[in-house]
Amino acid sequence: MARYTGPLTKKSRRLGTDLVGNDKSFERRPYPPGVHGRGRTKDSEYSLQLREKQKARYAYGVLEKQFRRYYEEADRAQGKTGDVLLQILESRLDNVVYRAGLAATRRQARQMVSHGHFLVNGKKVNIPSYRVSTHDIIDVREKSKDLPPIVIARETFETRDVPAWLEVRPNKGRILVHQLPTRDQIVIDVNEQAIVELYSK
């Protein structure tokens, strides 16, 4: 199954949530694409659960097979399955780069990681799905510090809302992972319990 690479704004409108982050096009038209003015039929429980899964999948850019593996891992772990699932997704390196404000979107962050622009604890990591751990140190590689997204991140850092579980030192191009995120630190418009119910059937 190929990764979806089309316009995310259309997916955002269909699923009713901003999958990109500060998507101006979605803000202007937050209703489903197509003909407007028709009343919506009541969604079934299954379709509501499926929508929540799709929202999470598209937001984090994860394929179905990988998403299911994340769910199965979360289901085996201690704690609430839905909370653990979101923690796993948030802990991906591409998401951490995005949350730290070093990329404008997760897609851009994924591309930057894939191109080898980051070190984790001093070693180059080019796998977007790499999972960070508490006390990890993520650095922009020296030769990558003049990349436009990194320069923009330094210049606009004061306007970024970085989650408390991360610390960013923009002038050094460094991200410190103080802890893994708790549910209340994960800002995503998704009902994770609906995802759990979908996979539990």
UniProtKB/Swiss-Prot annotation:
Could you name the domain of life of the organism this protein comes from?
Bacteria
Enumerate the Gene3D superfamilies for this protein. Ribosomal Protein S4 Delta 41, Chain A, domain 1, RNA-binding S4 domain
Segments carrying the region annotation (Disordered) are 1-45
Key word Transport present: no
InterPro entries for the chain: Ribosomal_uS4 (IPR022801), Ribosomal_uS4_bac-type (IPR005709), Ribosomal_uS4_CS (IPR018079), Ribosomal_uS4_N (IPR001912), S4_RNA-bd (IPR002942), S4_RNA-bd_sf (IPR036986)
Q: Which SUPFAM superfamilies match?
A: Alpha-L RNA-binding motif
Which GO cellular component terms are attached?
A: small ribosomal subunit
Alphabetical UniProt keywords = Ribonucleoprotein, Ribosomal protein, RNA-binding, rRNA-binding
Identify a single GO molecular function assigned to this protein.
rRNA binding
One record GO biological process: translation
Q: Where is the S4 RNA-binding domain?
A: 91-157
Q: How does it assemble?
A: Part of the 30S ribosomal subunit. Contacts protein S5. The interaction surface between S4 and S5 is involved in control of translational fidelity.
Under HAMAP family, the record lists: Ribosomal_uS4_B (MF_01306_B)
Identify its protein family. Belongs to the universal ribosomal protein uS4 family.
| Function as written in the Swiss-Prot or TrEMBL entry | One of the primary rRNA binding proteins, it binds directly to 16S rRNA where it nucleates assembly of the body of the 30S subunit. With S5 and S12 plays an important role in translational accuracy.
Protein name from the UniProt record: Small ribosomal subunit protein uS4
- The gene that this protein is the product of is rpsD
